[in-house]
Regions:
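Hydrophobic targeting segments
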Residues: 6-11, 30, 46-49
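Short, well-formed alpha-helical segments that are part of the catalytic scaffolds
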Residues: 17-37
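Short beta-strand/loop segment that forms part of the nucleotide-sugar
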Residues: 41-54
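Active-site-proximal specificity loops/subdomain of glycosyltransferases
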Residues: 52-107
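Short beta-strand-to-loop acidic/aromatic patch adjacent to the donor-nucleotide binding site
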Residues: 106-118
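Conserved catalytic core of nucleotide-sugar-dependent glycosyltransferases
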Residues: 120-266
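Long C-terminal appendages of very large multidomain proteins
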Residues: 219-373
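Membrane-proximal basic amphipathic "stem/tether" segments
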Residues: 340-470, 475-485
Length: 485
């Protein structure tokens, strides 16, 4: 295998905002001394850019873009300006498909980029070294960082200066980045009370706060050896994105995949503005018993891992830990590492009878978590949980059918069918309430509880439960959007 085959760096963007990201973030980081300038020019490296005619013309006089031509040939692939209603992700996928086809045709090494990326100095040199060592695919973990606070901090520290290459070491980059996680990423912290419903990444902080251990289903494709492919499958780009099942369709063998497991080797940051994408950190697990919170979180990880969204390759890679850190990985990490390994092992095991019994117990004793558990178990067990969760609704319908109760009016559709209330239909919850609130001694507390407003999550469940005669299932597209962000 020739070591002089070219690298094709590939990016899609349009519009003034992303054009600035390209010229002020991505290009300066790639032009640091040990990135693009460190690749041998004899390779004939190219930089494929899918963008509009307006954006292509606008970058011609930019200093960083002119410097790019010294190390890689810019190649423009014109795209028409997207219509306002065009799905952004699919527009990007069309561009990725064109560039991937060009890289396959030329037997090049492909590097998929986004304009809001920043790489540590030496990252591209690492890509070249791994490609020359015969690695067919190199993947790096991809999570979001907060643009509004991290970019000003890089400027304040002197790393990011207008019109200059951005030469920042991996530990300096991680030192800033780990203090500026985006709200989406904050929801992936395992020990947080606002743990994500669809955790595409899961991380744990280590002592002293200068590092995290992360396991992920979301990866950036940093090197793809198109010369190793006899056939190129681009069907993923028809209705999905490059971080879907594109790698699995072309490189299904896990032995072909190299995962960057240490930020010292290669570090990248992807910025997102909170003003463009924001998640409220709702501490719905606060106050839960630790064993309940842990079991629930492991259940959510397992459910996502085993869902149709995940391909076999992502499931195989998921147990691989990745270390992002700003100082040495020292023995103080050991306790966290051992704990993480135990938890990931449990998450990767198939749910047994005990898990199902715990799910049933939580559905009985923690009604607000009941609906979240429905999607994790299939078949009859899911139906049992569903029936118990909405037993008040089912009981009311049965009474209506039997002539024991009047039909619901439109006002009745606002009832809280999901939240429990004192009564024989909710025996366990009622008993717990009696003991906790001492209702027998203070009858007024019953009236006080009845007057309490329902929570926002329960109101949402009400709308789902009553909008079409009963509760509706969560649309699977939510999982797709959680994965693709």
């Amino acid at each position: 295998m020739s070591t002089l085959r070219p690298f094709y760096f590939m990016v899609v963007f349009w519009g003034a905002a992303y054009r600035r990201y390209f010229t002020e973030l991505l290009l300066p980081s790639l032009l640091s001394p040990n990135n693009l300038p460190g690749l041998r020019r004899e390779r004939g490296n190219r930089f494929l850019i899918v963008t509009t005619r307006e954006d292509w013309r606008a970058i011609q006089e930019d200093g960083m873009f002119r410097l790019l031509g010294t190390y890689a040939e810019p190649v423009w692939l014109e795209m028409r300006p997207p219509d306002p209603g065009d799905p952004k992700m699919l527009v990007m996928s069309r561009g990725h498909r064109r560039m991937a086809a060009r890289a396959f045709e030329d037997r090049a090494y492909g590097v998929f980029l986004s304009p809001e990326m920043v790489f540590s100095d030496g990252s591209v040199a690492t890509m070249g070294r791994l490609a020359d060592a015969g690695k067919k695919v190199v993947l790096g973990v991809a999570i979001r960082f907060r643009y509004e606070t991290m970019v000003p901090e890089m400027e304040r520290r002197g790393h990011l200066q207008p019109g200059q290459p951005l030469g920042i070491g991996s530990r300096d980059l991680m030192r800033i980045a780990l203090q500026n996680l985006h709200s989406e990423t904050l929801r992936y912290e395992f020990d947080a009370p606002w743990f994500a419903e669809y955790p595409v990444s899961i991380y744990w902080r280590v002592p002293r706060g200068d590092g995290i251990i992360i396991h992920s289903f979301s990866w950036a494709s940093l090197v793809i050896d198109y010369g190793a492919l006899a056939h190129h499958d681009t069907s993923t780009f028809e209705n999905w994105t490059v971080d879907g099942n594109y790698i699995f369709r072309n490189f299904p063998n896990p032995s072909d995949i190299y995962v960057v497991t240490d930020s010292d080797e290669l570090a990248l940051v992807t910025f997102t503005r909170e003003s463009e994408l924001h998640f409220d950190l709702v501490p719905y697990l606060a106050g839960r018993a630790p064993w309940i919170a842990t079991w629930y979180k492991l259940n959510q990880i397992r459910a996502l891992k085993d869902s149709e969204v995940m391909d076999p390759l992502k499931r195989r890679i998921f147990p691989t830990p990745v270390y992002l850190h700003a100082s040495e990985v020292s023995p103080v990490w050991d306790t966290t590492r051992l704990r993480v390994a135990r938890l990931i092992k449990r998450a990767c095991e198939a749910p047994g009878r005990i898990d199902k019994l715990v799910a049933l117990l939580l559905a009985l004793t923690a009604p607000d978590l009941g609906t979240r558990l429905l999607g994790a178990f299939g078949g009859r067990f899911a139906f049992v949980l569903w029936a118990w969760r909405y037993r008040r609704f089912v009981w009311q319908r049965l009474k209506e059918r039997g002539g024991l109760a009047a039909g619901r009016s439109r006002l009745d559709d606002g009832r809280d069918w999901a939240s429990p209330a004192l009564g024989p239909m909710n025996p366990i919850w009622s008993l717990r309430s009696l003991l906790r609130e001492k209702v027998l001694q203070t009858p007024s507390s019953v009236r006080q509880r009845a007057a309490l407003p329902t929570s926002g999550s329960d109101q949402l469940l009400d709308r789902e439960a009553t909008g079409a005669g009963g509760p509706s299932e969560r649309d699977e597209s939510v999982i797709h959007s959680e994965r693709s962000r």
